[in-house]
């Protein structure tokens, strides 16, 4: 019970901090800054399963804008952030789907088995071609029995010299499109910190540890083939900021994840 209380207190503190902190999104062309409407939707909650938490929970910490206007030749990045129990997953749906289909949509990601975790995850969708028509992009988040989602309608350029729907030519700098901002879990747990990248040519990924030193493969720290960082049996000394760095010939991008090991009072 004390372990659950520790995790919930940490989560509430992080949510409060996130709600008052100024979050700066990446620049996209002609964002509709006048729109302050909450466009998120939360599905009906099912009966929770018997796990370390009394119920699943999932909340947006950053919802995508309701609409964007694409400029000729501009790459757009739509950002979505949420925080919840276990390890929430985010996927993007292109095109309009009714609520019933969004609720029943099968996730294209393998759920990470982490019943004691509390995680804040960030995902972005890249549009690197000229749209031919207005299109809806929906950020769908899940954890356990909870599903939430929010949509953005992107309008095409008013006039374009480029061929619609054709990917922009040439190399593209890396953009980290899937990462975790914060990861809390009980000491002794194995955690996997994602770092998924959109780049052309393919980006090389390195990680810096909580002492700002490059991580060398070892028995407790491993960089996986997909760029994720696996930390086995986390300890109190693992607490701190971990940085993913993605590089290619065009440039680089970075993303930080704060790891917080929580004492399990039941041990």
Swiss-Prot record:
Induction: By 20-hydroxyecdysone. Residues 48-149, 174-260 form the Ig-like C2-type domain. One of its GO terms (molecular function) is insulin binding. Detected in several sites including the ventral neuroectoderm, the tracheal pits, the pharynx and esophagus, and specific neuronal cell bodies, where it is primarily expressed. Residues 1-25 form the signal peptide. It is found in: Secreted, Extracellular space. Its main location: secreted. PROSITE patterns: IG_LIKE. The keyword Phosphoprotein does not apply. Essential developmental role during embryogenesis, in particular the normal development of the nervous system. May be involved in some aspect of cell adhesion. This is Neural/ectodermal development factor IMP-L2. It comes from Drosophila melanogaster. The gene is ImpL2.
């Amino acid at each position: 019970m004390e372990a659950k209380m520790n995790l919930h207190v940490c989560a509430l503190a992080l949510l409060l901090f996130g709600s008052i902190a100024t979050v700066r999104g990446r620049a996209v062309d002609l964002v509709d800054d006048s729109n302050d409407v909450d466009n998120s939707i939360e599905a009906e909650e099912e009966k929770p399963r018997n796990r370390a938490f009394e119920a699943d929970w999932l909340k947006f910490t950053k919802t995508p804008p309701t609409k964007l206007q694409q400029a000729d030749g501009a790459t757009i990045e739509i950002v979505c952030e949420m925080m919840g129990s276990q390890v929430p997953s985010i996927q993007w749906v292109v095109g309009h789907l009714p609520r019933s289909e969004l609720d029943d949509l099968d996730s294209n990601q393998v759920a990470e088995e982490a019943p004691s975790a509390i995680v804040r995850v960030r995902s972005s969708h890249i549009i690197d071609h000229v749209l031919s028509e207005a299109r809806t992009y929906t950020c769908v988040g899940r954890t356990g029995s909870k599903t939430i989602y929010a949509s953005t309608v992107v309008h095409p350029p008013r006039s374009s010299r480029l061929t619609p729907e054709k990917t922009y030519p040439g190399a593209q700098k890396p953009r980290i499109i899937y990462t975790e901002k914060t990861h809390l879990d009980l000491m002794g747990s194995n955690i996997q910190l994602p770092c998924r990248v959109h780049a052309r040519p393919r980006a090389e990924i390195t990680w810096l540890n909580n002492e700002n030193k490059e991580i060398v493969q070892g028995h407790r720290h491993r960089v996986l083939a997909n760029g994720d960082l696996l930390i086995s049996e986390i300890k109190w000394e693992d607490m701190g900021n971990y940085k993913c760095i993605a590089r290619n010939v065009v440039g680089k991008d970075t993303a930080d994840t704060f790891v917080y090991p929580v004492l399990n009072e039941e041990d």
